[in-house]
Amino acid sequence: MEPKPEQSPHHAYPDHWEADVVLRDGGTARIRPITTDDAERLVSFYEQVSDESKYYRFFAPYPRLSDRDVHRFTHHDYVDRVGLAVTIGGEFIGTVRYDRIDDRGRPASAPADEAEVAFLVQDAHQGRGVASALLEHIAAVARERGIRRFAAEVLPANNKMIKVFRDAGYTQRRSFEDGSVHLTLDLEPTEESLAVQRGREQRAEARSVQRLLAPGSVAVIGAGRTPGGVGRTVLRNLLAAGYTGRAYAVNRAFDEGLATLDGVPAHRSLGEIDEQVDLAVIAVPAHQVPEAVADCGEHGVQGLVVVSAGYAERGADGRELQRELVRQARSYGMRIIGPNAFGIINTAGNVRLNASLAPESPARGRIGLFTQSGAIGIALLSGLHRRGAGLSSFISAGNRADVSGNDFLQYSFEDSDTDVALLYLESLGNPRKFTRLARRTAAVKPVVVVKGARHSGTNPPGHAVPVSRIPDATVSALMRQAGVIRVDTVTEMVDAGILLAGQPLPSGPRVAILGNSESLGLLTYDACLAEGLRPRPPIDLTTAASPQDFRDALAEALADATCDAVIVTAIPWVGEDGEAETGDGQVLAAALHTAVAGGSAKPVAVVHVEIGGLAEALAAASSTAAPRQRPTTARTAPPEAPTDREVPTDRTTDTDRTTATDRTASTDREVPTDRTTDTDRTTDTDRTTASAPAAPPPPAAPAAPEATPPAPEDRPRPGRIPAY
C-alpha cells in the first residue's frame, strides 16, 4: 500500500505532483513525492541496486544507507528539498531529488534559483525510461518552486545518465571538472524539450497498446464450465480465431482434478501457472475483480481486459469502484481496457487474437477500429464484414477508465498494419490532446471519427471524465483543422473506412463524375460542392452506354491530369433490343477494373442503383488486391503537421459530414447509441429498391496530409473499387 501523506512543517504534501506514467516498454508506474513513511521502502530499494549503480550515484563505494542518509532522503520541505519516487506495486524502482543551492553550491532558499539534482534507478528497470520520466516531472516541480536551473555531477563512465540529460532537449552547458562531468540545464521549456516529451509519451503509449494487442499468452479469468457464460464465450472466441500464443482458463470454482477446458490448461488461480502471462481477460462479478487484479499483479501480468460490468455505469458507488480498479492496476504497472469492455481483436497472422465477445473474428485488413460502445462495435464489425472489409485491430473500451481513443491514436500512428483509423467516441476526456494526436496521425494516415452524444451535453453512463462544454460546432472545426474526417453515422464510417483503406488518397479536390444517368450525376455534383470539393461537370454517357463505354470513359478520366478522383454513377442500361436491363454487375465490374489496371493513382468510387451483383463483384476484387504500401516508418511525419485549410465558422456543423449522393437516404440519420438493429439499414424514399447505401464522394485528403501526398509507389494496387 502507498504511504499516507504527512504534513511537512514547511509545506503541505503536494498531492498534485502524483502522476501515473507509461514507461518506454508500455508498462505503467506511479510517480509521487517521497514522505517520511518511506524509510523502509527506501532501504529495500537501495539494497536491490547494484554496486556499480551505487558508485555512479555517490562517486564511491556505498554499500548501504546510514540512518542519517535515510532521514535526509525521506524528509523534505517540498520547496527547497524535494524527492520523488517511481513506484510499481507500492515499491520504489527509481528516485530523484533536488536540493536548492546558491552560486557557491551551498544549501539555500529562495530567491536562489538553482538546484542540484541526482537520480538512482534499480538496475532491473534501467532502460525503461524511468530516469527520463523522473527528469520531466522533477523539472516541472522545480519550475513551480521558482528554480530555473539544475546542476548535476556525473561520472564520465555513466553514459546512461549523461544520455538522459543530453536527450532531454533542455538548453545545457557541460564542463569537465575534478574527474567528473558538470552539467547545467536551463529548465525553461524549449521546442526541442517539448518535442522530446511528446515523443516519449507517443512511443510509450503506443507500446502499451501494442502489448495488449499482441500478447504471447492469455489467461481468461472466469471461464466457467457451463457454456454460454461471458468468460467461456471469450475463451472459445480466442481459440476459434486460431490464437498463436498460449491460452489458459482460470476459475477458482474449478474442481481440483480438472486439467483442461476446451483443450487448454485449466487452473484455479494464476499462481498455479508456471509461465509468464501477458494478458488477462477478467470476466468475474465486480466484487471479485479486486482479488483477480491482485493475482494478476503478483504474477507479473502486463495488461487487463475487464469485461465485467457493475462500475461507473451503476452510479456514484460504481464510479468509486472504477477509480479504485484503475489505481490498483496501475500500482502493479498494468493498463486496463474497460471495465464493461466488449474486448479486443488483432488479426495479424502471427497473433490472431480475438479476446472479445464477437462470435466471429473479422478478416485481416488494413482498418483499425476503436469504439467506446459495445453495441456500436457490433454494428461496425457487422457492417464491415458484410462489405467484405477486414480489420487490423479492434478495441472496444467500454467505460474507458484507462485506455482511451488517445491511446489508440498513438498506436495507430505507429502501426504499420493499419492504413485507416476509425473511432466511435462518446466523450472526449482531453480534447486538446486528442486534437494534437489526431493532427499528427492524420498526417500519415486517414482518421475517421463519429462523435456520439453530440447534443446531450452529458457523458454516457460509465464515462467518468469531465463533461466537455465545447459546442459541437467547435468540435467539428477542431477536427477539421486537425485533418480528421468527421462523419455522422455508423454506415458513413463503414463507407469511409472501406474507401480509404482500399483507395489512394486524392492529391487534390478536383473530382470527375461520369455515368449513364444525368440526374444521378447532377446529384453527385451537388454533393461534392456541398463538401467543399471541386467537381467537373458530369459526363453523361446516356442510358445506352455499355460496360465498354464505362471502361473507356473511366480510363480517359484517370488519364486526365485535371482531376484527382473519379466517381462513376450507374443505373441499369438499355440493351440492344431497347429494353432496360437489370444489369450484370460482374460484367460492369470487370470493365471498370480493366480501366484501372494501368496503374492509376486516383481513387475511384461507384454509385449504382439496382445493378445486381455489382457491389459483390467489386468487393471480391478488392479483397484480393494488395494492401497499401506503407512508408518505412510513420515517425518521419512531423510531430505537429500544419494545416492550411480554412474552416468556415458558420458552417462547422455541416462541413465534416460525408454527403450521400441522394440527400434523402436514411443513412444520414443520427444513430442511437443504444440500438444496433437500425444502424446499417438503408431505406431510400427515392428508390423502389435500395440495393446499396448512397455513396459519399471520395473524401479529399485530410488537411494535414495535403502537403505531403503519398508517392505513387506508396499507393495501393489499382482495382480496389468500392460500390455504394
Regions found by a protein language model. Name each.
Residues 659-660, 666:
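Periodic short-repeat tracts
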